[in-house]
Amino acid sequence: MATMTEEREAQRTARRMRLDKALGDVVRTLRSMGAIRVMVFGSYVEGPLRRWSDLDILAVMPSTRSGAQWFRDVHAAIDTDVPVDIVTFTEQELSARRATSSFVRRALRTGRVVYEQGQEG
């Protein structure tokens, strides 16, 4: 009979596997849309993971559209079985937000780059 601690650990392991799969799917979708850089931040990187943990992603997209336009397009294209919060910026928007947004500064400081254009393979 599993203890409560063992059950929680099994739940966290199962959640990590679902989040890992979803992250791979999201990165593939963002790459196909032309992403310049993709970062994951929040509990996925910093812990602790809980059974309700989601993915927090910051995507730097080409300047062919605004971050707001990319946001709509990206969210329409993403389909995962776990909650995913994605914020999208162009390089210029990200530079401007870095100066004014503690949320953006924290995501950049604590996040982990999982894709960068030109750094594949």
Model-derived segments and spans:
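Catalytic core of pol beta-like nucleotidyltransferases
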Residues: 1-37, 45-51, 62-121
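Short beta-strand->loop micro-motif that forms the acidic, two-metal-ion catalytic signature
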Residues: 56-59
